[in-house]
């Protein structure tokens, strides 16, 4: 019989904004956002919950955010501050278990299956972790507890902020039935729209499709869909998780017709990229990359060997790549290559 696992997913609440709020308590009762300080061309990185009540959201253009909330306070990002808080939180995770898989500065998976303390209760362990984080940093996070990574991550988002949601093995079947397929790991807009054309919007709908049908429509990803729809996820929490790259990209509603228009998108992309990187990522950078997709859906990219993440170096790549374009730009992606340099044509996307 397979041993049931006990997985916790911790996701810090509005992390950048909460760190700023802790550093400056006068912000606590005011709507504010981090990033996007250029009112005309900026993009919001994150915001506090008061700002969200006005409809402000992450990745929203600052101009739109200011329309929704004219009194919105805009703060520059301070990654040194966020990394310092993240390091404290990471140490707390490791004080409970060695099986920690960091995903970014503000979230991680923990496998507490073999933790004997707290009566071997994942729920009690999650509560203790949340309390320890608050005691040492004054910050709150939300936790999801479940038999696997898929469900733990979904659960951590249910009772935000400062929430805890538990899915026991006995509750898995009933929980997934009404779960929207868009919540499943790996299901993006394209897959979601494709499933919608097949009259699939919930996991119960997805369960009606055979494995053969899913493999035919989605290739190898069909295996994942078949399992995820049933609340099955055999991915391990990998404490030595090796990533070959970290990258971000954005598709723009209005085509970027000039070089300046492309360069104006760099600050928000750069902030988004750095927010996804951990201290370990910074230590293992071996290259940087820029990718474009134009209005004809032609994809081009440039890579350079590099030891550090340098905004000016990425800017020069954008300029060089743009000069090779014949059509307006629809998508821009930037990223870093991690590990050993295999060749000059490093593929991140």
Swiss-Prot record:
Binds 2 magnesium ions per subunit. Transmembrane segments: none annotated. It comes from the Bacteria. GO terms for cellular component: cytosol. The active site is at residue 107. Monomer. This is DNA polymerase IV. It comes from Francisella tularensis subsp. novicida (strain U112). The lineage of its organism: Bacteria, Pseudomonadati, Pseudomonadota, Gammaproteobacteria, Thiotrichales. The gene is dinB.
């Amino acid at each position: 019989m397979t041993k049931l696992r006990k997985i916790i997913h911790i996701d810090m609440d509005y992390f950048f904004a909460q760190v700023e709020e802790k550093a400056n308590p006068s912000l606590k009762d005011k709507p504010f956002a981090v990033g996007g300080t250029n009112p005309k061309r900026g993009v919001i990185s994150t915001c506090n919950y008061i700002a969200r009540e006005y409809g402000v959201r992450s990745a929203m253009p600052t101009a739109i955010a200011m329309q929704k909330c004219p009194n919105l306070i805009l703060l520059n990002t301070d990654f040194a501050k966020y990394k310092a808080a993240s390091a404290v939180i990471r140490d707390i995770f490791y004080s409970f278990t060695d099986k920690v898989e960091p995903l970014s500065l503000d979230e991680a998976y923990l496998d507490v299956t073999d933790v004997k303390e707290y009566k071997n209760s994942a729920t009690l362990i999650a509560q203790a972790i949340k309390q320890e984080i608050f005691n040492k940093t004054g910050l709150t996070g939300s936790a999801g507890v479940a038999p696997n990574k898929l469900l733990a991550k979904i659960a951590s988002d249910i009772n935000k902020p400062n929430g805890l949601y538990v899915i026991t093995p006995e509750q898995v079947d009933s929980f997934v039935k009404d779960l929207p397929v868009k919540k499943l790991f790996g299901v993006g807009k394209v897959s979601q729209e494709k499933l919608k054309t097949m009259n699939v919007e919930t996991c119960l709908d997805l369960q009606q499709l055979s494995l053969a049908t899913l493999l035919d429509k989605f290739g190898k990803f069909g295996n994942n869909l078949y399992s995820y729809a049933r609340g099955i996820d055999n991915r391990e929490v990998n404490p030595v998780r090796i990533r070959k790259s970290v990258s971000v990209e954005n598709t723009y509603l209005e085509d970027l017709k000039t070089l300046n228009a492309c360069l104006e998108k760099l600050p928000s992309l750069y902030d988004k990229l750095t927010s996804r990187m951990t201290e370990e990522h910074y230590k293992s950078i071996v290259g940087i990359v820029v990718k474009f997709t134009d209005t004809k859906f032609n994809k081009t990219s440039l890579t350079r060997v590099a030891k550090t993440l340098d905004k000016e170096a990425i800017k020069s790549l954008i300029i060089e790549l743009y000069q090779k374009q014949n059509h307006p730009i629809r998508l821009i992606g930037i990223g870093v290559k991690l590990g050993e340099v295999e060749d000059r044509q490093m593929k991140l996307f």
